[in-house]
A protein has these predicted regions:
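Predominantly the C-terminal beta-signal and adjacent terminal strand-loop region
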Residues: 90-94, 173-217
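Outer-membrane beta-barrel domain signature
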Residues: 56-60, 102-106, 151-155, 198-200
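Outer-membrane beta-barrel translocator domains and adjoining extracellular loop/strand segments
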Residues: 45-52, 92-100, 141-150, 190-197
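Gram-negative (and chloroplast) outer-membrane scaffold detector with strong preference
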Residues: 39-41, 70-146, 206-216
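Short glycine/proline- and aromatic-enriched beta-strand/turn motifs that initiate or cap beta-hairpins
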Residues: 23-70, 216
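Cleavable N-terminal export/targeting peptides
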Residues: 1-29
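Residues that define the transmembrane beta-barrel architecture of outer-membrane proteins
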Residues: 29, 63-67, 107-113, 127, ...
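Membrane-spanning beta-strand positions in outer-membrane beta-barrel proteins
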Residues: 32, 80, 126-128, 171, ...
Length: 217
């Protein structure tokens, strides 16, 4: 075979591999990290405290906006697991009605890491909706709660509840995505007095709406 024919054959072989090489270089990684700003809208459910004339749902936990980081691993194009993290968040507590009127009951800190299994639709498109379900582990700490002039109050240290979510990623570049996400989480605790007697059940059960960006690698 002449040199020119060999060169033509090699060139043809190299050109034929270009689509596969291009596909490999643009293939998305299994990991995604997102940063979001999340509005925590608390449910504010609670059982009554008859001894203080506190009616049902009169204990209100502050709603607020918090930072959030999540780490997602894609097992396949459609199936993923997401770990949602933040730092302990301070929540003020108010009692809207009681025998001594409305009052500020203090505050507590809440750390609610959440793990969900997800199904991602349209994984090769720019618009990629998903749904998920899993568990939330709520760690309550630093509680400074009280009924003025009557007693101090305490929350149970932890609670494990369900979580569901829906959202979407929108592809901006090969690695960068815009994200919106909504979650509902079970976050609950028993409220006890200094003697360790349960006086109420508090249901924070927030709806969390987040907006942010993700990086896939």
């Amino acid at each position: 075979m002449s040199r020119s024919l060999k060169l033509a054959a090699i060139t043809a072989a190299l050109v034929s591999t270009l689509p596969a090489v291009a596909q490999q270089t643009t293939q998305e990684g299994n990991w995604m990290v997102r940063a979001r700003a999340v509005n925590v809208d608390t449910y504010n459910g609670s059982t009554p405290i008859p001894s203080l004339a506190v009616p049902k749902d009169a204990i209100h936990v502050e709603s607020k906006v918090i930072p959030e980081i999540d780490i997602t691993y894609f097992f396949t194009k459609n199936i993923a697991a997401e770990l949602i993290l933040t730092v302990p968040q301070k929540h003020d507590v108010k009692v809207k009605q009681s025998a001594i009127g409305a009052f500020d009951a203090g505050h507590f800190y809440l750390l609610p890491p959440t793990l969900t299994a997800q199904w991602h639709f349209n994984p090769d498109g720019n618009f990629r909706p998903y749904v998920g379900a899993g568990i939330t582990y709520s760690d309550f700490s630093g509680d400074q709660l009280h009924v003025p002039g009557v007693t101090r109050l305490h929350l149970d240290d932890s609670y494990v509840g369900f979580a569901v979510q829906a959202g979407f990623d929108y592809k901006l570049t090969n690695n960068l995505f815009f994200n919106m996400d909504i979650k509902k989480a079970q976050v609950r605790s028993d409220l006890e007095n200094d003697a360790g007697v349960k006086v109420s059940r508090v249901k924070v059960d927030p709806i969390l709406v987040g907006v942010g960006f993700g990086w896939r690698f």
